[in-house]
């Protein structure tokens, strides 16, 4: 304890004197080691030092009040003038240093320090470190890492991956696939299909159909119809009409007219004649000269002059 206090009071300036005195004692080396450790901030080891230093003054005589050479005045009475040579050869006893006035230890020392503590412990070590921590742990590990993380996880995995992703998903799936695509889509669908195609289109439609066809066309139309037909034709026309008929014919003509009638006949001539020279009604065998006057005779179909009786019959 005395050596400890001396070391604390005088610091490194008294190291030489203190160490010289410690060399006379077998315990000096051990005590020096602990004093040296205490000098660099390990004052909590004071109680340990006190225990180790108790034996240092047991062989001393007196209380060492004079502080000269560690021997009391009564030792002088034991020596006489004839013992000066012996005095020089005598091994000096350990010098007991002065105690502090109050005899109290360092008030800042830790009274709970472990006397068996490791003297080589790092003074800057984390006091809150887990004593059960893995000594082989990675010192560069992420302190914010998930303690419940999968230890078998892929270290090269994408850190931005979706944590809610399907763990059974195809690892060879297309990473550029549309995330909004229809999950029920046909996997055998044509990859070159028109993405703008009508989703309501007839799946049984003719794949060779005209893409420019009229979307408003009659679905019941004749598939064998003439593709060159007049698109402005009368849809109500007679399908049995003569295809060789005169396209310039009078649409208001009498459908019951004589097809053998004179096409050059006067259309303004009255059929109901009132004298000679007029055509007789209901006589298809008669041919009348429309330009003849009343005195002209009516000719028959053979261009013969009729008899008077024949004329009178029709008059």
Curated annotation (Swiss-Prot):
Where found, per UniProt? Cell membrane; Cytoplasm
GO CC terms for this protein?
cytoplasm; plasma membrane; side of membrane
Q: Where is the composition biased (Basic and acidic residues)?
A: 69-89
According to the UniProt entry, which residue ranges have a biased composition of type Polar residues? 269-285
sequence repeat ranges per the UniProt record:
107-110, 111-114, 115-118, 119-122, 123-126, 127-130, 131-134, 135-138, 139-142, 143-146, 147-150, 151-154, 155-158, 159-162, 163-166, 167-170, 171-174, 175-178, 179-182, 183-186, 187-190, 191-194, 195-198, 199-202, 203-206, 207-210, 211-214, 215-218, 219-222, 223-226, 227-230, 231-234, 235-238, 239-242, 243-246, 247-250, 251-254, 255-258, 259-262, 263-266
Q: Where is this region: 40 X 4 AA tandem repeats of P-N-[AV]-[ND]?
A: 107-266
UniProt region (Required for the binding to heparan sulfate proteoglycans (HSPGs) on the surface of host hepatocytes), positions on chain? 88-95
| Keywords of this entry | Cell membrane, Cytoplasm, Glycoprotein, GPI-anchor, Lipoprotein, Malaria, Membrane, Repeat, Sporozoite
Q: Quick check: keyword Glycoprotein in the entry?
A: yes
Region described as Region I: 96-100
Give the bilayer topology. Answer: Lipid-anchor; GPI-anchor
UniProt keyword annotation of Transcription present: no
Function of this protein? Essential sporozoite protein. In the mosquito vector, required for sporozoite development in the oocyst, migration through the vector hemolymph and entry into the vector salivary glands. In the vertebrate host, required for sporozoite migration through the host dermis and infection of host hepatocytes. Binds to highly sulfated heparan sulfate proteoglycans (HSPGs) on the surface of host hepatocytes.
* Free-text note on domains in this protein's UniProt record: The N-terminus is involved in the initial binding to heparan sulfate proteoglycans (HSPGs) on the surface of host hepatocytes. The N-terminus masks the TSP type-1 (TSR) domain which maintains the sporozoites in a migratory state, enabling them to complete their journey to the salivary gland in the mosquito vector and then to the host liver. The unmasking of the TSP type-1 (TSR) domain when the sporozoite interacts with the host hepatocyte also protects sporozoites from host antibodies.
Protein name as it appears in the record: Circumsporozoite protein
